[in-house]
Amino acid sequence: MAIVKCKPTSAGRRHVVKVVNPELHKGKPFAALLDTKSKTGGRNNYGRITTRHIGGGHKQHYRLIDFKRNKLDIPGVVERLEYDPNRSANIALVLYKDGERRYILAPKGLAAGDQIQAGAHAPIKVGNALPMRNIPVGSTVHNVELKPGKGGQIARSAGSYVQIIAREGNYVTLRLRSGEMRKVLAECSATIGEVGNSEHMLRVLGKAGANRWRGVRPTVRGTAMNPVDHPHGGGEGRNFGKHPVTPWGVQTKGKKTRHNKRTDKYIVRRRGK
């Protein structure tokens, strides 16, 4: 893994910082694990914008990732590591002993030729998946389930991980990267290690067009709009002088957005404390 700063041969290249990984496969992905991915442009079935700043971008295939890790007690060998345009993490193509191939999230330290396994009695080794009741307290894990058998939902992006800090009865207590501590059923599975490609955060796109390649459209400030378009709009010169709100008048910047009382009891400590 190398951080490469581009030479300033043009204004668009001047600030570009790339993350180069020579370990990644340079050929095509495994065709049987690809699915179609159609663009929405941020519109719903009525054609109305439901998510702003989405549109365009390069065509992509979706890679079918095994988040459930439910091929139990069947050893597999990592064939290669690959780039995935749909996520910040890299992925690994695994060939299992029964001949099936699956993509998994590539943890830090995993390389082509490594053996991995999933199951209650799998060894504590990077890339292996097992129920958290069998993982030692203090271990670093990723791709953590919230419900047994549903598949990993926590710690899936590049460089992310969760630490198991306690085990009491049927629950384990996890410390998330945000600082939040929450309880999860000990039967839920997790994968040992942290997600690889942690240098992803160091990359610099360098120009607006690089964001457009990724399907991200410009974000216009509310103060630059007319009063008809945004509560912050209008006025001669730069006028603001009010509490910041969304284009629909809902308070923002500090307003609580969590509305799931049902699972509040599982949060031991809120994030940022």
From Swiss-Prot:
Compositionally skewed regions (Basic residues) per UniProt: 253-262
GO cellular component: large ribosomal subunit
SUPFAM superfamilies, A to Z: Nucleic acid-binding proteins (SSF50249), Translation proteins SH3-like domain (SSF50104)
Pfam families in the record: Ribosomal_L2 (PF00181), Ribosomal_L2_C (PF03947)
GO MF annotations, alphabetized: rRNA binding; structural constituent of ribosome; transferase activity
Protein's GO biological process: cytoplasmic translation
Stretches the record annotates as Disordered: 221-262
Highest taxon of source: Bacteria
SMART domains, sorted: Ribosomal_L2, Ribosomal_L2_C
Keyword terms of this UniProt record: Ribonucleoprotein, Ribosomal protein, RNA-binding, rRNA-binding
Subunit (UniProt): Part of the 50S ribosomal subunit. Forms a bridge to the 30S subunit in the 70S ribosome.
Family classification: Belongs to the universal ribosomal protein uL2 family.
Function: One of the primary rRNA binding proteins. Required for association of the 30S and 50S subunits to form the 70S ribosome, for tRNA binding and peptide bond formation. It has been suggested to have peptidyltransferase activity; this is somewhat controversial. Makes several contacts with the 16S rRNA in the 70S ribosome.
Protein name as annotated: Large ribosomal subunit protein uL2
